[in-house]
From Swiss-Prot:
It comes from Spiroplasma citri. PANTHER family: PYRUVATE KINASE. Coiled coil: none annotated. InterPro entries: Pyr_Knase, Pyrv/PenolPyrv_kinase-like_dom, Pyrv_kinase-like_dom_sf, Pyrv_Knase_brl. One of its GO terms (molecular function) is ATP binding. Transmembrane segments: none annotated. Its EC number is 2.7.1.40. SUPFAM superfamilies: Phosphoenolpyruvate/pyruvate domain. The gene is pyk. It catalyses: pyruvate + ATP = phosphoenolpyruvate + ADP + H(+). Its cofactor is Mg(2+); K(+). This is Pyruvate kinase.
Length: 192
């Protein structure tokens, strides 16, 4: 494989495409690259390491063939909180249902507390996005501007305009989670 010039300028804006079963061939990756894709995303929640490794090899082959670099983004399986809806309802939490509606909030400078979770839903609520509001509203009253968006991948981001102490923030979440009797593993991402 040819080596790329390390000093060559790369585009800062990336067009990311998730590679999955429908794009599982070198030809498909090449077609995506020709139509403007700059980065392939590999979701390690689905597929084994050998399958994902083959996709990386294909991307490198296409990259060498065309003569331009293709970035590879690995979306590894992160920590998950498994919410048992029945258990939450027994705790008398207010759960609000909304059909295909979510709040999106993206200021230029903010801190994100980012975590993944899986909702175990009954057939009735499978089509709806759930918002668990009651316990999280306590954070709003503590001078945080809180916005909550649910995405297709069930990834939640909490965005804070102010710059609170991260440890204070995590301890607030720890209290909430302790009241739910659920263990939370989280990571803090700082957006610059």
């Amino acid at each position: 494989m040819d080596k790329f010039n390390i000093n060559e300028k790369m585009k800062r804006t990336k067009i990311i495409t998730t590679i999955g079963p429908s794009t599982h061939s070198p030809g498909a990756i090449e077609e995506l690259f020709k139509t403007g894709m700059t980065t392939i995303r590999l979701n390690f929640s689905h597929g084994d390491h050998a399958e994902q490794g083959a996709r990386i090899v294909w991307a490198r082959e296409v990259s060498a063939k065309i003569g331009k670099p293709i970035s590879v983004l690995l979306d590894t399986k992160g920590p998950e909180i498994h919410w048992r809806i029945k258990g939450l309802l027994q705790k008398s939490l207010n759960i609000y249902h909304q059909m295909n509606n979510s709040l999106m909030f993206s200021p230029s400078f903010c801190k994100f507390l980012h975590y993944h979770y899986t909702l175990l839903l009954s057939k009735k609520t499978k089509k709806q996005l759930l918002k668990i509001v009651k316990k999280l509203k306590k954070l709003q009253s503590q001078h945080y501007n809180l916005a909550h968006g649910l995405r297709e991948t069930w990834t939640s981001s909490f965005c804070f305009n102010e710059r609170p102490s991260i440890w204070r923030l995590l301890s607030s979440f720890k209290q909430i989670v302790t009241s739910f009797k659920i263990s939370l593993v989280s990571k803090v991402l700082i957006k610059l």
